[in-house]
Swiss-Prot record:
It is found in: Secreted, Extracellular space, Extracellular matrix; Secreted. Ca(2+) 1 binds at D122, D197, E199. Keywords: Calcium, Collagen degradation, Disulfide bond, Extracellular matrix, Glycoprotein, Hydrolase, Immunity, Innate immunity, Metal-binding, Metalloprotease, Protease, Repeat, Secreted, Signal, Zinc, Zymogen. The gene is Mmp3. Hemopexin repeats lie at residues 285-334, 335-381, 383-431, 432-475. PROSITE patterns: CYSTEINE_SWITCH (PS00546), HEMOPEXIN (PS00024), HEMOPEXIN_2 (PS51642), ZINC_PROTEASE (PS00142). The active site is at E217. This is Stromelysin-1. Changing P93 to V/G/N: Induces partial autoproteolytic activation. Glycans are attached at N118. It comes from the Eukaryota.
């Protein structure tokens, strides 16, 4: 039997704490051996161990593994250790620098290209594109880094799906266990990320969530090693999240990536905060009030703006708490008590609606030629007010909600789609007939009605969570 001396010595050192029998014992020892070889640097041709258990190389490696993964350091193959070893994880080893690869490799530039070479069949292409884009955004939010996607040629980060042996001499192992692996920054295959296509990739909490795994692997592509902090994204063992909408990096992740690239710097693409005198005390409008509702909600360059009366909260992944400002401190001509707001990302423009008029802004700039009549969009004259609006980047469509109906606008053709309006209840079951605001995050749509918020999965076509409107404020 290949590796028999290793397995015999492993059993001598660690069997006593994990009662196994026959083939089960052999299987457990083989799992341990491979785990220590793959992730903790155990030599594959170990022929001699000292007879004293607490000084054997195997016991020391078990203790090293237990310490890193946050387990009790028994030096034995106990049930907690065995359970954790069977959980899905990243294929990158755990030994090395605490938060970065040895030598701290990093990209020597702040703008990095990526390319999605091929796609899994588990998800629509647009869902894969969105998951990768959001995963990179997680790191972009806390660094000076920016990312752009190319469709052909060699990118800094090449992203692909593969099974078993796939050309890098580190084969995948089929469903479960190793989910993906990635390489540190550098030329050639360095920086690339590979995903095991034998997994069942999803964009929700069933199966293996592509966004969460991609965010972890792309951390490696940027130079981060595994973290021993179980709360960190860079912890090696996969942890499913039931609240993808409020996902944020741990401080450990932020400290690690900023040790390589520094904190984010303000640029023309970032909304600059006004002077302190224009920033308000949130107690002016209690953001954690159970009765809080919003006039409109929109994204703006990766942030989320929550509008209420003359004010708005600005929520960014960079800060745990939202800022609170007067609308006029950013955009003096915009109306208060607006009806709806939405961002068209490929135009870098946010549109504000009140009554039968529409305004347009780009960062701090209020665009010339506005306000215009909402009827220039093709809405009928009978519509004098929009309740809520959202533009979906993948579809290049904008949805306008009016009472219990909605219209759909084609951003590419710049015209209303035929066969609209349609009933909200038929296309968004469970949402109800009153929509105050809506925006998209992490592949879900968030509909606001009064002080309530509904998380809607557009792929499943159903409501997945009922939340308070201010759940984004850590209340």
């Amino acid at each position: 039997m290949k590796g028999l001396p290793v397995l015999l010595w492993l059993c001598t050192a660690v069997c006593s704490s994990y009662p196994l029998h026959g083939s089960e014992e052999d299987a457990g020892m083989e799992v341990l051996q491979k785990y220590l070889e793959n992730y903790y640097g155990l030599e594959k041709d170990v022929k001699q161990f000292t007879k004293k258990k607490d000084s054997s190389p195997v016991v020391k490696k078990i203790q090293e593994m237990q310490k890193f993964l946050g387990l009790k350091m028994t030096g034995k193959l106990d049930s907690n250790t065995m359970e954790l070893m069977h959980k899905p994880r990243c294929g990158v080893p755990d030994v090395g620098g605490f938060s970065t690869f040895p030598g701290s490799p990093k990209w020597r530039k702040n703008h990095i290209s990526y390319r999605i070479v091929n796609y899994t069949l588990d998800l629509p292409r647009e869902s894969v594109d969105s998951a990768i884009e959001r995963a990179l955004k997680v790191w972009e939010e806390v660094t000076p880094l920016t990312f752009s996607r190319i469709s052909e040629g060699e990118a800094d980060i090449m992203i692909s799906f593969a099974v078993e042996e796939h050309g890098d001499f580190i084969p995948f192992d089929g469903p479960g266990m190793v989910l993906a692996h990635a390489y540190a920054p550098g030329p050639g295959t360095n920086g690339d990320a590979h995903f095991d296509d034998d997994e069942r990739w999803t964009d929700d909490v069933t199966g293996t969530n592509l966004f969460l795994v991609a965010a972890h692997e792309l951390g490696h592509s940027l130079g981060l090693f595994h973290s021993a902090n179980a709360e960190a994204l860079m912890y090696p063992v996969y942890k499913s999240s039931t609240d993808l909408a409020r996902f944020h990096l741990s401080q450990d992740d932020v400290d690690g990536i900023q040790s390589l690239y520094g904190p984010p710097t303000e640029s023309p693409d970032v909304l600059v905060v006004p002077t302190k005198s224009n920033s308000l005390d949130p107690e002016t409008l209690p953001m954690c009030s159970s009765a809080l509702s919003f006039d409109a909600v929109s994204t703006l360059r990766g942030e989320v703006l929550f509008f209420k009366d003359r004010h708005f909260w600005r929520k960014s992944l960079r800060t745990p708490e939202p800022g609170f400002y007067l609308i006029s401190s950013f955009w003096p001509s915009l109306p208060s008590n607006m009806d709806a707001a939405y961002e068209v990302t490929n135009r870098d423009t946010v549109f504000i609606l009140k009554g039968n008029q529409i305004w347009a802004i780009r960062g701090h700039e209020e665009l010339a030629g506005y306000p215009k009549s909402i009827h220039t969009l093709g809405l009928p004259e009978t519509v004098q007010k929009i309740d809520a609006a959202i533009s979906l980047k993948d579809q290049k469509k904008t949805y306008f909600f009016v009472e219990d109906k909605f219209w759909r606008f084609d951003e590419k053709k710049q015209s209303m789609d035929p066969e609209f309006p349609r009933k909200i209840a038929e296309n968004f079951p469970g949402i109800g007939t009153k929509v105050d605001a809506v925006f998209e995050a992490f592949g879900f749509l968030y509909f606001f009605s009064g002080s309530s918020q509904l998380e809607f999965d557009p792929n499943a076509g159903k409501v997945t969570h009922i939340l308070k409107s201010n759940s984004w404020f850590n209340c």
